[in-house]
C-alpha cells in the first residue's frame, strides 16, 4: 500500500491562530485517491480530530484507509504521533511527548528535524523518537540530507512525508508498506518522494492569504501579517 504519512486538514486551524491548512479530511482523501494512494495518516497540529473524522469518512471509499494522528508541538520541535486517538499536550519535553505517544499505542516520528523554516527544530533530539522523517517534501535538500545522515548513522527507522497543507500537494512523499506503525518500527517501509515546488508553495500562500482576508473582512478587520503564512 502507498501511504501519505504527514498531512494537515482544516482541523489544524483550531489549534493555531491562522489558516494553517485549507482542506477538509474528505477533500484530502479524494485527492490522495486521485494520486494513487491507498491510505493517509492525518497529522493535524496538536489535534487528532481531523484524523478521527477522516477515518470515519474513509469508510465510504472502498479500499482506502485513514490512520488518525497528530503533529505534536513539543518543547523543542515537532513530533508526528502516528496511530493515536487522544490529544497530547503541547510544550512537553521530547522524552515525555514520546512516552505519551507510546502509551497511546502510537509511534513517534521526528518531523523535519533540521528544517530552517520551522523553529525550534529537534535536530539531534530526533534520536529520542521512534523514527526520523528523513524526507520532507517542503524541506530543503540540505535539511533532508542532515536528517538522513544522522538517522542512517545511528540506525534509526525512517519515513518520508509531503507535509501537505492542502490537497494539491498530498502524496508528494510517503511510504510503501502494509502497516505503517509496525513496518516503520521494523524498518520495512519503502520511502518515496519528490519536492514540493516553490510555485506550489507560493500558490498555497496566496490561497491562505485569501482565506485570512475573507475571515478578517467578515470580522471587521482587514490587517494582514506576513508571519501568518505557513510556508
Predicted regions and their residues:
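Short active-site-proximal "capping" loops at secondary-structure junctions
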Residues: 45-50, 72-73
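Flexible loop residues that form catalytic
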Residues: 45, 113, 137
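Aromatic-lined carbohydrate-recognition surfaces of secreted/lumenal glycan-active proteins
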Residues: 109-117
Amino acid at each position: 500500500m502507498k501511504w501519505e504519512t504527514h498531512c494537515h486538514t482544516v482541523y489544524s486551524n483550531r489549534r493555531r491562530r491562522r489558516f494553517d491548512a485549507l482542506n477538509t479530511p474528505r477533500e484530502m482523501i479524494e485527492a490522495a485517491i486521485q494520486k494513487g494512494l491507498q491510505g493517509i495518516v492525518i497529522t493535524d497540529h496538536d489535534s487528532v480530530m481531523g484524523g478521527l473524522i477522516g477515518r470515519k469518512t474513509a469508510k465510504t471509499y472502498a479500499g482506502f484507509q485513514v490512520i488518525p494522528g497528530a503533529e505534536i508541538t513539543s518543547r523543542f520541535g515537532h513530533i508526528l504521533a502516528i496511530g493515536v486517538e487522544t490529544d497530547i499536550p503541547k510544550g512537553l519535553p521530547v522524552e515525555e511527548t514520546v512516552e505519551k505517544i507510546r502509551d497511546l499505542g502510537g509511534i513517534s516520528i521526528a518531523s523535519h528535524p533540521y528544517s530552517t523554516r520551522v523553529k525550534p527544530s529537534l535536530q539531534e533530539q530526533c534520536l529520542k523518537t521512534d523514527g526520523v522523517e528523513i524526507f520532507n517534501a517542503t524541506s530543503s535538500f540540505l535539511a533532508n540530507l542532515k536528517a538522513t545522515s544522522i538517522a542512517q548513522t545511528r540506525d534509526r527507522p525512517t519515513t518520508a512525508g509531503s507535509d501537505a497543507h492542502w490537497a494539491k500537494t498530498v502524496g508528494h512523499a510517503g511510504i510503501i508498506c502494509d502497516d505503517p506503525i509496525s513496518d516503520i518500527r521494523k524498518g520495512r517501509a519503502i520511502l518515496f518522494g519528490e519536492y514540493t515546488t516553490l510555485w506550489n508553495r507560493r500558490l498555497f500562500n496566496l490561497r491562505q492569504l485569501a482565506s485570512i482576508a475573507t475571515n478578517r473582512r467578515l470580522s471587521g478587520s482587514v490587517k494582514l501579517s506576513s508571519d501568518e503564512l505557513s510556508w
